[in-house]
């Protein structure tokens, strides 16, 4: 089961809604194939999953 995304950047609604997620999380979900480190203003290390097909759009 894919995790939900609160801040979707681009959604694909051709089937099940899936999106490129803008959420910053303490660690990427184990199923994420493209996890990128994000620099934050607070200095806290956060990550963002950039796998387009991965997240369900929670805010739809």
From Swiss-Prot:
SMART domains: BowB
Reported tissue expression: Expressed in bulb (at protein level).
A single GO BP: negative regulation of endopeptidase activity
Residue pairs linked by disulfide bridges in the UniProt entry: 5-21, 11-19, 28-35, 32-49
SUPFAM superfamilies with a match to the protein in the record: Bowman-Birk inhibitor, BBI (SSF57247)
Molecular function GO terms recorded: serine-type endopeptidase inhibitor activity
One GO CC annotation: extracellular region
Keywords: Disulfide bond, Protease inhibitor, Serine protease inhibitor
Keyword Disulfide bond on entry: yes
Site residues, Reactive bond for trypsin: 13-14
UniProt record similarity statement: Belongs to the Bowman-Birk serine protease inhibitor family.
Known role: Serine protease inhibitor. Strongly inhibits trypsin (Ki = 0.22 nM) and very weakly inhibits chymotrypsin (Ki = 1200 nM). Does not inhibit bacterial subtilisin.
Protein name: Bowman-Birk type proteinase inhibitor C1
């Amino acid at each position: 089961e894919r995790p939900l995304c609160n801040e979707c950047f681009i959604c694909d609604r051709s089937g099940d809604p899936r999106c490129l997620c803008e959420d910053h999380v303490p660690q990427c979900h184990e199923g994420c194939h493209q996890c990128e480190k994000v620099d934050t203003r607070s200095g806290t290390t956060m990550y963002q999953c950039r796998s387009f097909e991965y997240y369900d759009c929670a805010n739809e």
